[in-house]
């Protein structure tokens, strides 16, 4: 089960969206795969600096908070697209309370 959020001038749940819909150069995306202990960190080339910072902070803090730093944080765009294209959609959002505790 994948959980995710899109960060683009705010934080939006990625629930029921296909990875191809959200992995754009304008967005930053954090997708959590708890079963496989992977966190996908997508930072679009045209995304704002603030959004890139928030996405990176969220991904790395989720790693420590949920996995004690043991999860694999994947940032290579080609790897992200290849691995996530096997999933039809994002199943759920990352809890707002967890995001709030990390980003404030």
Where are these regions (language model features)?
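Long, low-complexity regulatory segments enriched in Ser/Thr/Pro/Gly and acidic residues
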Residues: 1-104
């Amino acid at each position: 089960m994948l959980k995710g959020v899109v960060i683009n001038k705010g934080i939006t749940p990625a629930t029921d969206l296909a990875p191809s819909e959200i992995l754009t150069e304008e967005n930053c995306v954090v997708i959590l795969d708890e079963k496989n202990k992977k966190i996908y960190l997508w930072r679009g080339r045209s995304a704002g600096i603030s959004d890139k910072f928030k996405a990176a902070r969220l991904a790395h803090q989720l790693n420590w908070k949920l996995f004690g730093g043991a999860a694999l944080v994947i940032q290579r765009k080609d790897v992200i697209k290849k691995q996530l294209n096997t999933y039809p959609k994002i199943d759920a959002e990352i809890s707002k309370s967890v995001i709030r505790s990390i980003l404030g």
